Every structure is written in C-alpha cells, then in structure tokens.
Amino acid sequence: MSPAQTQWTSVGPDGGDARAFAAVPGQPQHLYLGTVNSWIYESSDGGTSWRRLSRLSASDDLVIDHIVVDPRNPARIYAAAWVVDHPDGGLWLSLDGGRTWAEVSALHGQSIRSFAIAPENPDLLFAGTLQGVFRSADAGASWTQISPAGSREIHEVESLAIDPADPDTIYAGTWHLPWKTTDGGKTWHNIKKGVIDDSDVFSIIIDPAQPKIVYASACSGIYKSLSAGEAFRRIQGIPSTARRTRILRQDPQHPETVYAGTTEGLYKTTDAGHTFHLMTSDDVIVNDVSIDPADSDHILLATDRGGVLASTDGAKSFAASNTGFSERKVEALIVDANDPHRLYAGVVNDKSYGGAFVSSNGGAGWKQIADGLGGRDVFVLAQAADGTLLAGTNSGIFGLPPDSSSWQPRSTIANTLVKTATETLKGTRVHIEKRVKDQLRQMDGRVFAIDLSGDSWLAATTGGIYTSRDQGATWQGGPVLGVAGYLSVTSHSSLMAAARPDGVVLSKDGGQTWWPMSIPTVLTRIHRVAFSSDGTLWLGAREGVYFTRNNGKTWMWAQRVPIVDIDDLYYDAASNRVLVSSRSSDFVYAMDPATLDWKWWQTGYKLSAVRAAGDRLLAASLYDGVLIEPRAAVAELGRK
C-alpha cells in the first residue's frame, strides 16, 4: 500500500448505531460488536473501550445482527448479515479472530435475519433467511434448507432458538407467526396458540435449565410458554408503544430475570415475566443485550444512535461506553478559524444523541454541544468572525455564541414587499409604489449551505436563497427566478453565486438581484460551487469539476482529475487548493487553481466532505465519524 493509500483514522465523535454483541466463551471481557455498515469492533476490557477490527466486505451496507464465536476455537467466528433496502447479505467466516473474513459461498446473497449454534454441538449451525431455515452439520462447510422450499408460511425468519437438550427441536419466528420442528426440520407445525395473529416474532429464548419454558417477543407483545411452545400467554406490563421487542435475554445466573430490549427502552422482569419495569429512558432503541456470565450486574446494550450503554448495577443505571466506537454520519465539519486543533462536527439521524460536537484536541476527544437544537440534524456548520457558530439544520438555522452553551434560533425571515397603491393627486390618479414589511416567519426547511465570508451572510435552503446583514438576526430572500431548492452558496468580494441541481445564479449587489449563469450543457446535476481567491468559480457536478474565470462566459472542464459524482468541493485558502470528494468514492483530490496540477489520497472510507486543519486533512465520513489523515500519508501526484 502506498503512503497515499494509508487508511485514515476514525477519531469520533463516539457513538452511533450498534447492532449485536458476541462474547468469547470463557473470556467474558473479550467482546465483538456488529454495526450497520459492515464493520466489526473488538473490546478486550468488557466493553469499556473498543477498537475498529475489520470490515466483512468492501461494501458498506451490511447490517451485522449476529456474531457467533466457536466455543471450541475462539479464533473461529461467524458473522451473519443482511442489507436494508434489498434482499442481500450472507454469512462470513473468520479463522483468525476476526482480522480477516471469507464469505461462505453456500449462503451468498441470503438476507440472514437470524443465526444460531447448537449449544451442545458447535458443528450444528442454523440460519434464518428471507427464504426459510437453513442448517449446516459441518461447521458451515455445507448448507441445506430444512424448511419447505417455497413455503408461504416459513420464510422471513427473524428469530431462531435451538433446544439445549435436543438440537432437532428448533423454534423459528417469522414475520407472521412462530413455528417449531422436533425432527430437525423434516416436519414443522405452527405454535400460535395464545399468540395474536399476524405477529412478527423478533426473538425467542429457551430456559436452558427448563427447556419447556420458552419466551417469544412479537410486535403484539411478549409471550411465555410453559409447554415448549404448544401454548403461550401474553405477558402484561410492556406498553403497547414499546412492543417491538427486538431482543430477549435471560440472566444466566438468575433465570427468573429476563431483559426485553424494545424500541422504547429496556425492560426487566425479576419474577419470570409477571411484572416488567422500564430501566432506561424511553428514547433508547435497544438492538441487543449482553450479560456478563461472570457478573450479571454488568450489562451492555447495543442501541441505535447512542452506541453502547453499560451498567454495573444490574440495569439500575447506564452510561455511554463508546470509547473508540464511532458510527456517526457526519455531514458538517469545520475547523476553528483561530485554533486548528479545535474541530466542530454536525451529524444526522441521531436525534437527541446527535446534533453538533466539538473537539478541542484535534479529534482525540469530543463533547456534544446540542442543547437547544431539539434533536435536529445538522447539515452545515459555519463560523462568524466573532467566533459564533451557525448550524444549518433540517429545520432552520441556529446560532451558538462563544460565551453560550445553548443554541438559539436564527431563522427569522423579514422580507420587505413592494406594493402598488393608486392615489389621486390634484385630480389625477397615479400609481405609487410603497415598501412595506412582510409578516415575520421562520425558516422551516432544510438548510444546505451557509457562507459567512462576505459583508452579507448567505444561506441556501429548500425555500430558496437568503441573505442577512445583521449577523443572522433576520434573513431576506426566498425563491430565486421562480426556483426554491438551492444546494450551495459561495461569495467573493462583491460577487455571490448559488447552485441548484440544474443551474447556477450570480449576484453582484449582495443578493438583492440575481441573474442566471450560462453553464455547460453536458451537466445533469450540480452539487457545489466555490470561489477561489483569484475569483475563479468552481463547480462540482455529476460529470466532474468545471470552472469559469469570467463569470460564466466560458467554462473549462478539469478533465485530468479522475472523479465524477462530486458531492463536496471546497476552496482551502490557506494552502490555495481546491479539495474535491464524492460520496461514492473513498478518494480525496486536491487541485492547484492556477496550474490545475492535482494530488490524491485514498482514505478507505466513503466521504461527505474534506477540510484542512493545519498541515493535515480531515474528512467527514458517511458512516464512520470524522477521519484524520495519518502522518505517514503522502499525496500521490496526478497524471498531467
């Protein structure tokens, strides 16, 4: 690997979506953690800290919901995965403790929703897929479907459980109802007595000491059977809004204690299901529960948005345990104008766990600064000359002064309208134009870009282009030339430019008036515009990088730079270079605006933006937090 291909380092912010745990048998402090983007993490201290271990495949869309460690050989690990938006996934095998993986060809393309290993025979493996139930008797070397092929009932198998006393007894929960076989899959029968019809069965567990006791969770509630599933009764105590119980987990030391991880918090029963109590806030979405077999007071939760939560007191209290774990979708990234070690990041999809973050040590540690944002997504960050931060969100603009700890709305639209009135002067009717203030209103759509470099501040939003001459206290504007959705803005001296997907407009009077620019006819979608210090306007589009040095009279294509589908284009004034990246690529390109010479780096991650911090580059990734260029990385020169 060349220095330019040295993988960049993810430095946070910690947290994000965590999916599934696996503990090494006999080594409860040694854990693995699956994610929604093909990565697996490892912990050697019981989940106190994590390190990014490996990626199952080059794709970044595998949801890893099941990791199983062979109890005979801890270096042998299985990882089962599926893909969110289409039927795909598979099974991967590692023989070196998770450092490298090979796909199991027999299950290639199978969307594996459940996976289990026989408690008394580790050679027996079971996979529940969208097609049905599959079984391997040789530790995954070969697989056979044991549910009826083409069955209209036993498919979309979300949960599996194997009787610890009899591996031929298998429970399968589908998106419709639970099923059972007692002969290794030769025959199946529905076990729906007591279960509300059309119940998605998310999790099934069997009491290892009393296998006739079976718990099942469904969208209609939690059920318990005392007859090996032949009859169920619904357990009371879980609110109807929290009945999407994704995981059930029994305390190995106290079988009367069962944890239920729901979409509205963690519930716990200590009396075998007679009563349940909420142990977390109801905004916690629980995907998995891990109970330390050596210390059942030590509990880990894999959650959406909040990452890993840890308890050392039997779930009475939880705290984040995400050191080294970062699965954040970072959309905004800026470096403090006066301190290159101070970084700000804006994330999306994490609601109250997201918003904005600050690092004062170059990414080594992060602090959430989201008070006042109300769980909004942050798509853009900008810093004013006085240090005030502006955040463009999915619902307006917010400001954070240097001496404040809470964001305040800065989204007031105060337009002035020109109205024509008819009056009679000295017997003659004349038309008089009057300027009147429009009713104040608030921006309520997404803010795509903010530029604070000129005398007037500039914002691109779903509602159009807005300018402010009072540091964001009020904004003026709206649709420009009859079009509202603008994605990017930039300013240089008295010039302003704004881009929408199919065009660019230019203003020479601080945004009072706009006129359309001529653009190359080959362009089908524009994402970004930026001025360099010499007044050149750069344009990032689906077809590549284009630029004009005469306000659109003529355009040139920077065809030597081998990148298309450009999503971010940024002028780095300190180094006089144009930085370019794409969400469909892990490459970063830097171009000299005068000579058009270019360099490249390969980061190893899909990117949403690239910025400079002193002598190093930073990147906002699509799924893996903020990335930092390693000291060893040396850019490769591009071909001329």
Enumerate the predicted regions with their spans.
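Blade-level signature of beta-propeller repeat domains, shared across WD40, Kelch, NHL, RCC1
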Residues: 604-640
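Conserved Ser/Thr-centered positions that define the repeating blades of beta-propeller domains
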Residues: 43-44, 71, 94-95, 119, ...
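Short coil/turn segments that connect the beta-strands within blades of beta-propeller domains
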Residues: 28-29, 74-75, 122-123, 167-168, ...
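Short coil-to-beta transitions that initiate beta-strands within beta-rich domains
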Residues: 11-24, 57-70, 106-120, 147-165, ...
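Short, solvent-exposed loop/turn segments at conserved positions within beta-propeller repeat blades
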Residues: 83-88, 153, 197, 241, ...
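Short loop/turn segments immediately following the C-termini of beta-strands
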Residues: 36, 82-84, 130, 175, ...
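An edge-strand/N-cap motif at the start of beta-rich repeat modules
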Residues: 2-40, 51-52, 288-294, 298-312, ...
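A short loop-to-beta-strand structural motif that recurs across blades of beta-propeller domains
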Residues: 39-42, 89-93, 132-135, 177-180, ...
